[in-house]
């Protein structure tokens, strides 16, 4: 929690941003599902592109997993494609003050990335929204 999410105000001013939410207690998957279900689309996520602090894997290997991970998965796992244990732990991990999840139209990607770079943010896409399919969220 080094900085506030004030950049969200700038993101919201871009016409290419179609949805945005902070990633908190329902974790990345829960908030992504809210966007998908509210917009009647699905998402395909490249798990290897989801940012994660390096030391988190050590904690997972030690079995230090928040109880909220399982509760989150129980509440929305039926709408998610198959996940291994590590994917489930990372993608269902409840956050107190997570980052922003932003949906950007493909034609606006350059403008979005320029705004990010101008604000010292090095962001990359983690997936894409697609015509609604089942499951609502799937991983590559």
Model-derived segments and their meaning:
Residues 1-12:
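Active-site glycine-rich loop that binds ribose-phosphate moieties when present
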Residues 13-140:
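Glycine-/charge-enriched secondary-structure boundary and capping motifs
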